[in-house]
Amino acid sequence: MKNKLPPFIEIYRALIATPSISATEEALDQSNADLITLLADWFKDLGFNVEVQPVPGTRNKFNMLASCGQGAGGLLLAGHTDTVPFDDGRWTRDPFTLTEHDGKLYGLGTADMKGFFAFILDALRDVDVTKLKKPLYILATADEETSMAGARYFAETTALRPDCAIIGEPTSLQPVRAHKGHISNAIRIQGQSGHSSDPARGVNAIELMHDAIGHILQLRDNLKERYHYEAFTVPYPTLNLGHIHGGDASNRICACCELHMDIRPLPGMTLNELNGLLNDALAPVSERWPGRLTVDELHPPIPGYECPPNHQLVEVVEKLLGAKTEVVNYCTEAPFIQTLCPTLVLGPGSINQAHQPDEYLETRFIKPTRELITQVIHHFCWH
């Protein structure tokens, strides 16, 4: 029953008080089961059918899909339930206690992005879901901050094909229709150790990596020259060499060298295409030194994403907000949800608060966010 739903600020407070940190380091990683249970119970109280889905390959993580209404199409509102870890020494407040001060709501996940679910639930108080003409879906995912395993698994397994979707990441209520992807690789070269007094008796991995880096930098130049998307502030794919390590002593021939690099592809560039370009760039080294060079993923890759600028979702949201859609450089779950339906990224709070100590959401976003959610539900589920 709707009268069982707590007030908006109490929903917000309960979400922030329920830890759901995701991290690659097992000691820091937490299940989101308690948070999913909270959300599931509230959406059931509002008359939604709720499905909780274990996400394979995770440490006890779950997705939740709440649905109401019949038929095809409809609207999907989506977000992730996890937060990043926090640095206790840099927070001046308890990360798990929602506090309000000077027009700001503080707490871990206030902006990125547990708060979005509080806004959805609050907006639905005044919506008679029994009268929806098209279905409304609410998706809460797991592990966005690490592998995006929840969104990947949902997109791979669901039969849903809504008319459109909105992911409530913090965009300061500026609609986002495209962003770059992210690929992170480790280049490893296995040499042969030996005493530095006789270089011919070994294979110096640092020297081979020097050769490989030259080819990688040529790839970087080629990407900049061949691919352009003028809407981005950096209108080409970027390639960064971020970390390198090799050798253990000045008088030993280096036996192993490892380089970590990333590429941020433009929308429309496929992961297979990028892998092919990287392998082609490194082919001269691999051919000269067979079996000594390997390329491994550091993280699951994220493709670029774009919602067609002339889609009805873009037109409706731009009209409601009086603002044009933007493109951004950070990544979200949109590439995976976009495989199901046209998708925008749009939510309260600033991306500048994401992953920051003393994270907050400004209270000025409360009224317009509630109004926006109500309006998009009316447009896509009642018309």
Swiss-Prot record:
Can you tell me which residues form the catalytic site?
82, 144
| Entry keyword Hydrolase | yes
The cellular location(s) given in this protein's UniProt record come to: Cytoplasm
Q: Which UniProt keywords apply?
A: Amino-acid biosynthesis, Arginine biosynthesis, Cobalt, Cytoplasm, Hydrolase, Metal-binding, Zinc
GO cellular component terms listed in the entry, alphabetical order? cytoplasm
Residues where Zn(2+) 1 binds: 80, 112, 169
Hydrolase as a keyword?
A: yes
GO MF, one term, reads: zinc ion binding
Q: Provide the residue positions that the database annotates as binding Zn(2+) 2.
A: 112, 145, 355
Q: Which GO terms fall under biological process for this protein? A: L-arginine biosynthetic process
PROSITE patterns for this protein: ARGE_DAPE_CPG2_1 (PS00758), ARGE_DAPE_CPG2_2 (PS00759)
What are its E.C. numbers?
3.5.1.16
Record note on cofactor:
Binds 2 Zn(2+) or Co(2+) ions per subunit.
Q: What SUPFAM superfamilies would the database entry show?
A: Bacterial exopeptidase dimerisation domain, Zn-dependent exopeptidases
The first-level EC class reads hydrolase
User: What cofactor requirement does the entry state?
Assistant: Zn(2+); Co(2+); glutathione
Its pathway, per UniProt, is:
Amino-acid biosynthesis; L-arginine biosynthesis; L-ornithine from N(2)-acetyl-L-ornithine (linear): step 1/1
Describe its partners and assembly state.
Homodimer.
- Stated family: Belongs to the peptidase M20A family. ArgE subfamily.
Task: Please give the NCBIfam families that the UniProt record associates with this protein.
Answer: AcOrn-deacetyl (TIGR01892), PRK05111.1 (NF003474)
Job description of the protein: Catalyzes the hydrolysis of the amide bond of N(2)-acetylated L-amino acids. Cleaves the acetyl group from N-acetyl-L-ornithine to form L-ornithine, an intermediate in L-arginine biosynthesis pathway, and a branchpoint in the synthesis of polyamines.
The protein in question is named: Acetylornithine deacetylase
